[in-house]
């Protein structure tokens, strides 16, 4: 995993991926996978395909927020019930949510 990530390059890549035809959630996951050199399978990107435009067009949640939360879960999430790793995952996801909302004014 690459831990020396240029956030401007990551953002530029996400925009490039978005303009090539992926939606926000797909673009965010793909760009994070590239920047951090993670072994995220294409199926994870496919799993995010229902998030765009606020959960399938319902306008409820920004796909970029959902995609970012999925990547945090990939790195810090749990795979068994009761695993205390969930606490750090929640903490980081809330921090991401709050920063996104502060910068963009909403998560919807």
Task: Identify the role of each PLM range.
Residues 1-108:
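Structured, active/binding-site neighborhoods that engage oxygen-rich ligands
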């Amino acid at each position: 995993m690459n831990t020396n990530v240029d956030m401007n390059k990551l953002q530029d890549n996400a925009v490039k991926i978005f303009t090539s035809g992926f939606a926000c959630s797909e673009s965010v996951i793909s760009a994070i996978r590239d920047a951090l050199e993670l072994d995220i399978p294409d199926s994870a990107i496919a799993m995010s395909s229902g998030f765009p435009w606020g959960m399938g067009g319902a306008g409820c949640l920004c796909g970029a927020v959902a995609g970012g939360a999925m990547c945090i879960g990939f790195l810090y999430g749990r795979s068994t019930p009761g695993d205390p790793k969930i606490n750090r995952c929640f903490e980081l996801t809330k921090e991401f949510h709050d920063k996104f909302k502060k910068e963009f004014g909403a998560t919807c």
